[in-house]
């Protein structure tokens, strides 16, 4: 057992960590085989870079370690920017935007090669697939934060709310689609295109300053930030139309159900509840809670979204039902009931409490599920074990890819 796993195991009793997966789920997990189809627009040229990059990685480095390093760089660089721009209306030093560009590009690169490293070292396992998607669900929250801060979307409150939550929704829908049809489907415009576009946006802000996005587009009267907004809207329409075409066409289960034999619409309740609570609390706040604290607000709900997305990924891999009852909703619930009782506690204080609870709940769940799966498969989370799980990769793609 590695240092990180050993530390997590020693912390487990103090964090009240329980094993979240049943014996039946673990058995189904062993039988899971990764299946993906399609390719995005920039993937072919990027494959050349990814194949070159993975050859530079030492064989002793575990795939999950690669992903985690990328995620930490992405998160830390975004948090530095957020410290300068807590309301997404401020400017920040040029190096913070440059740092975000580097952090996101490094994450994209490392996230793209972790699967290649797993196959290269014969260390592919269901844990790696779950870990990869789990990191993506957290990264998307911070990509949203970096985007609104870089283009100063705080000057357009309604659009800022949209951009904060639409990324979480689309990533959840991608996993929802997989839960229905059993195959992860990549579109022409997908997450790689999003990450590269946001990286370019960070670089433009670093070179030209955040004032760039406030300049007026000639003959339109619209600010420059309208351009990335239109891109986000177009991407949302394109991606969601693809997702829901698959979802509404019926699943691979009995009578067109999901892989778990449940209704294809049932996962919509979870993300729907997150978005509904976020919107209601935003609109009903007497202190403009979201407008005054958009980054903190997004984190509080983003951690909830990340957890339910991870649980949906696991539900797909274990062919099991995803329950609506979840401790992830405690934080948003506190905000809702505080408003219901006329905000007898300062909303800002409750928001901090909700964010801490949501983060702690996500951390507890991630640690417990990783340790449980690793123990069951007799592998290490952050090291390449001598006793690795058997290769369980079945791909319909014609090249190596995640």
From Swiss-Prot:
The gene is chpt1. The keyword Lipid metabolism applies. It is found in: Golgi apparatus membrane. This is Cholinephosphotransferase 1. Changing residue 119 to L: Reduces the enzymatic activity to about 20% of that of the wild type. The record marks 129 as: Increases basicity of active site His. Pathway: Phospholipid metabolism; phosphatidylcholine biosynthesis; phosphatidylcholine from phosphocholine: step 2/2. Changing residue 132 to A: Reduces the enzymatic activity to about 20% of that of the wild type. Changing residue 43 to L: Reduces the enzymatic activity to about 25% of that of the wild type.
């Amino acid at each position: 057992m590695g240092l990180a796993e050993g530390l997590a195991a020693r912390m487990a009793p103090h964090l009240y960590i329980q094993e979240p997966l049943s014996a039946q789920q673990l058995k189904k997990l062993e039988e899971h085989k990764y299946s993906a189809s399609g390719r995005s627009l920039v993937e072919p040229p990027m494959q050349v870079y990814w194949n070159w990059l993975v050859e530079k990685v030492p064989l002793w480095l575990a795939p999950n370690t690669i992903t985690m390093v990328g995620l930490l760089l992405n998160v830390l660089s975004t948090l530095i920017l957020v410290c300068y721009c807590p309301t997404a209306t401020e400017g920040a030093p040029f190096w913070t935007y440059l740092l975000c560009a580097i952090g996101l590009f490094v994450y994209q690169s490392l996230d793209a090669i972790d699967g290649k490293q797993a196959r290269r070292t014969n260390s592919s396992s269901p844990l790696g697939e779950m870990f990869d998607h789990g990191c993506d669900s957290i990264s998307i929250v911070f990509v949203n934060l970096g985007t609104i801060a870089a283009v100063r979307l705080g000057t357009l409150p309604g659009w800022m709310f949209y951009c904060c939550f639409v990324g979480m929704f689309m990533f959840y829908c991608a996993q929802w689609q997989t839960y229905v049809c059993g195959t992860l489907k990549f579109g022409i415009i997908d997450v790689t295109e999003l990450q590269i576009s946001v990286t370019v946006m960070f670089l433009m802000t670093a070179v030209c300053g955040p004032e760039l996005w406030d300049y007026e587009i000639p003959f339109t009267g619209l600010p420059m930030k309208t351009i990335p907004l239109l891109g986000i809207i177009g991407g949302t329409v394109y991606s969601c139309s693809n997702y829901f075409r698959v979802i509404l066409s019926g699943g691979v289960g009995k009578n067109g159900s999901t892989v778990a034999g449940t209704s294809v619409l049932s996962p919509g309740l979870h993300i729907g509840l997150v978005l509904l609570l976020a919107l209601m609390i935003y609109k009903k706040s007497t202190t403009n809670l979201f407008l005054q604290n958009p980054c903190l607000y997004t984190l509080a709900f983003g951690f909830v979204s990340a957890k339910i997305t991870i649980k949906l990924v696991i539900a797909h891999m274990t062919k099991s039902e995803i329950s609506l009852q979840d401790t992830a909703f405690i934080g948003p619930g506190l905000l809702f009931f505080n408003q219901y009782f006329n905000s007898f506690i300062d909303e800002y204080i409750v928001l901090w409490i909700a964010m801490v609870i949501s983060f702690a709940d996500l951390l507890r769940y991630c640690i417990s599920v990783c340790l449980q799966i690793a123990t069951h498969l007799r592998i290490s989370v952050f090291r390449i074990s001598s006793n690795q799980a058997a290769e369980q990769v079945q791909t319909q793609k014609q090249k190596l890819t995640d």
